[in-house]
């Protein structure tokens, strides 16, 4: 009787053990996934993926590309959180998308902060709109430029900005905001400086090659003036950290020096005429520039060269116009040109034949 009772007990034990083994045996994943293929998720899930797709398809050439991308990603993450919480009850999906949503919102806030309208002081607005805005300098970068190591100073009429052979050129760089200044050399009037023009751009360019120099001209306020002044040393360090702004300054200073050379040719040039200057120089300006270069390069004394240039420019209107070669300094050796015969010209092998352009 005991043997008959033990047989069903053994059978039940084996059956229980096999059922446990079956429960531990892994089920092929294809069976469960294929069964889930027929399930269609809620509409919120699909709208979230549409938001992701639209955000990734925004062209990078669009001005607000990054802002629109972050908006669409944030909207998609929000819909994912709603879908995982209300329709799927998936805690892990909700947590991950909440993290992604927070990251996108932080980045979106930073982008909107950078795009905020930057307020430029009214007194500096003219300088920005005339000099820096046409060169696509952002307002925030201009504000950084004018907000550090920079101050606005005032000069009354008759006060001196710089004195020749006394004032150092290594201290500052300035832009005239209001008024008018007069530049002279040894009592000779050279030109005027008008608003939105650099006051000491030639000196700034010269100090990049030679340090410790003095002003060679005297600059006096011809009216009540206000000007924007940078510390030369700190401005140089700042421009080294901003390559784009460094190139902008190189261009603006070079253009300002060119305008001052135009003013040397016509001292009566006013601010309105300066705005209308043509890119190409007139014949009179070319002659004046040639005289100045020849005078400076041919004279051992800078003062004699300037006097020669001033006398030549003042008498240009009264004297008959001659060729640039005739007005060259006597110390400069003229270019020797071969005399051509009617038929042909023979030139020695060591000689250089120069043809004069019409």
Curated annotation (Swiss-Prot):
GO molecular function: cAMP binding; structural molecule activity
Region (Disordered): 313-350
Nucleotide-binding among keywords: yes
One biological process term in Gene Ontology: positive regulation of receptor recycling
Membrane topology: Multi-pass membrane protein
Region (Required for interaction with KCNK2): 136-186
Localization per Swiss-Prot or TrEMBL: Lateral cell membrane; Cell junction, Tight junction; Membrane; Cell membrane, Sarcolemma
Amino acid composition bias (Low complexity), ranges on this chain: 313-323
Keywords of the record: cAMP, cAMP-binding, Cell adhesion, Cell junction, Cell membrane, Developmental protein, Glycoprotein, Membrane, Nucleotide-binding, Phosphoprotein, Tight junction, Transmembrane, Transmembrane helix
Modified residues (Phosphoserine): 295, 318
Cytoplasmic side: 70, 114-358
Ranges in the topological domain labelled Extracellular: 1-48, 92
Tissue specificity field: Expressed in epithelial cells, skeletal muscle, heart and intestinal smooth muscle (at protein level). Expressed in fetal and adult heart and skeletal muscle.
Deletion phenotype: Skeletal muscle regeneration appears to be less efficient and delayed. Knockout mice are deficient to adapt heart rate to physiological stress, this deficiency develops in older mice. They show severe sinus node dysfunction with long pauses and intercurrent periods of normal synus rhythm. The sinus node structure is abnormal with a loss of pacemaker tissue from the inferior part of the sinus node and a compact structure of the superior sinus node. They have inpaired functional recovery after ischemia/reperfusion injury.
Chief location of this protein within or outside the cell: membrane
Required for interaction with CAV3: annotated segments: 93-115
InterPro entries per the UniProt record, alphabetical: cNMP-bd_dom_sf, POPDC1-3, POPDC1-3_dom
Reported function: Cell adhesion molecule involved in the establishment and/or maintenance of cell integrity. Involved in the formation and regulation of the tight junction (TJ) paracellular permeability barrier in epithelial cells. Plays a role in VAMP3-mediated vesicular transport and recycling of different receptor molecules through its interaction with VAMP3. Plays a role in the regulation of cell shape and movement by modulating the Rho-family GTPase activity through its interaction with ARHGEF25/GEFT. Induces primordial adhesive contact and aggregation of epithelial cells in a Ca(2+)-independent manner.
Subunit field text: Homodimer. Homodimerization requires the C-terminus cytoplasmic region. Interacts (via the C-terminus cytoplasmic tail) with TJP1. Interacts (via the C-terminus cytoplasmic tail) with ARHGEF25/GEFT (via the DH domain). Interacts (via the C-terminus cytoplasmic tail) with VAMP3. Interacts with KCNK2; the interaction enhances KCNK2 surface expression and is inhibited by cAMP. Interacts with CAV3.
Family according to the record: Belongs to the popeye family.
Alphabetical list of PANTHER family matching this protein: BLOOD VESSEL EPICARDIAL SUBSTANCE, POPEYE DOMAIN CONTAINING PROTEIN
Protein name in UniProt: Popeye domain-containing protein 1
Source organism of the structure: Mus musculus
Lineage summary: Eukaryota, Metazoa, Chordata, Craniata, Vertebrata
Gene: Popdc1
């Amino acid at each position: 009787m005991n043997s008959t009772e033990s047989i069903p007990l053994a059978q039940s034990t084996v059956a229980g053990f096999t059922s446990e083994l079956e429960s531990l045996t892994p089920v092929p994943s294809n069976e469960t996934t294929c069964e889930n293929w027929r399930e269609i998720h809620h509409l919120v899930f699909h709208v979230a993926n549409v938001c992701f797709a639209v955000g990734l398809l925004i062209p990078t050439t669009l001005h607000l590309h990054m802002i629109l991308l972050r908006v669409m990603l944030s909207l998609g993450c929000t819909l994912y959180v709603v879908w995982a919480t209300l329709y799927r009850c998936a805690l892990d999906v909700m947590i991950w998308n909440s993290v992604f949503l927070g990251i996108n919102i932080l980045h979106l806030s930073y982008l909107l902060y950078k795009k905020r309208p930057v307020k430029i002081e009214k007194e500096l607005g003219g300088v920005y709109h005339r000099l820096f805005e046409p060169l696509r300098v952002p307002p925030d970068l201009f504000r950084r430029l004018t907000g550090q190591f920079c101050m606005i100073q005032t000069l009354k009429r008759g006060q001196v900005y710089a004195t020749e052979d006394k004032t150092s050129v290594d201290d500052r760089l300035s832009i005239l905001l209001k008024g008018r200044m007069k530049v002279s050399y040894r009592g000779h009037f050279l030109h005027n400086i008008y608003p939105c023009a650099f006051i000491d751009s030639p000196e700034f360019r010269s100090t990049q090659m030679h340090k410790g120099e003095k002003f060679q001209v005297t600059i006096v306020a011809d009216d009540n003036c206000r000007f924007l002044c940078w510390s030369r040393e700190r401005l140089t360090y700042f421009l080294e950290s901003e390559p784009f702004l460094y190139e902008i300054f190189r261009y603006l200073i070079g253009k300002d020096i060119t305008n001052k050379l135009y003013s040397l040719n016509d001292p009566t040039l006013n601010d309105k005429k300066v705005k209308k200057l043509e890119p190409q120089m007139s014949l009179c300006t070319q002659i004046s520039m040639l005289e100045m270069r020849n005078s400076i390069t041919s004279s051992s004394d800078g003062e004699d060269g300037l006097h020669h240039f001033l006398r030549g420019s003042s008498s240009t209107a009264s004297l008959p116009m001659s060729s640039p070669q005739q007005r060259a300094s006597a110390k400069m050796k003229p270019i020797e040109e071969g005399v051509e015969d009617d038929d042909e010209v023979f030139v020695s092998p060591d000689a250089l034949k120069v043809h004069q352009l019409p």
